């Protein structure tokens, strides 16, 4: 069963994260937090099919996977995620595969979410956006982002020392009008 193997894999990720301490924060959100976020972001969308979820800082992919527990059609979830760290990107891809997610329902990218918007093709707005971005990380906040559709309507950029705020704006940009976003912030 894919879920049993996938759950075992997530358990091992959690054990590794516990042993890695603070450094693990870049790829792991505790299961209790992940479940609460999934339950909240699925409220009112339980019957939606297909359901598109996006995590622009996907880490291990657990935030996206947990949404299935709260949807009537869990096999119609499409997963869209991006991760900067290549090793962590591969960890997430393996996590989704071990949970039985078909490659047709996986749209993952290894890249810098804030530096270059992704995804830029359909679908680029989602039923749910979930994320646990790196806390108070730095980002370029270059003037070119003032004309970036994700940020331009605000007329001002997140400070260079507050990438978490830029992630929040990125999430709003990719959220459907009827969608729900869950984000872990300091």
PLM features per residue range, with description:
Residues 1-17:
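Long recognition/docking surfaces used for binding and targeting
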Residues 23-131, 136-145, 151-154, 185-186:
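Conserved S-adenosyl-L-methionine
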Residues 2-6, 23-31, 161:
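Conserved phosphate/pyrophosphate-binding and hydrolysis machinery centered on Walker-type P-loop NTPases
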Residues 5, 9, 137-138, 142-143, ...:
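Short, flexible segments with low predicted structural confidence
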Residues 18-22:
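Conserved adenine-nucleotide phosphate-binding loops and their immediately adjacent elements
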């Amino acid at each position: 069963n894919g879920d049993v193997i996938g759950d075992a894999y997530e358990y091992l990720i959690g054990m590794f994260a516990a042993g890695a301490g603070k450094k693990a924060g870049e790829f792991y959100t505790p299961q209790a937090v992940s479940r609460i976020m999934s339950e909240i972001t699925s409220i009112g969308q339980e019957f939606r099919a297909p359901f598109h979820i996006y995590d622009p800082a996907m880490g291990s992919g657990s935030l996206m996977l947990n949404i299935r527990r709260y949807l009537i059609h869990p096999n119609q979830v499409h997963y869209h995620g991006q991760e900067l760290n290549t090793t962590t990107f591969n960890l997430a891809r393996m996590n989704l595969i071990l949970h039985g997610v078909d490659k047709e329902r996986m749209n993952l990218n290894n890249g810098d979410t804030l530096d270059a918007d992704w995804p830029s093709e359909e679908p680029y707005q989602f039923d749910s956006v979930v994320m646990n971005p790196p806390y108070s990380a730095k980002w370029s906040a270059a003037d070119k982002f003032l004309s970036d559709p994700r940020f331009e309507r605000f007329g001002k950029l997140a400070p260079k020392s507050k990438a978490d705020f830029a992630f929040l704006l990125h999430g709003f940009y990719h959220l459907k009008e009827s969608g729900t976003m869950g984000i872990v912030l300091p």
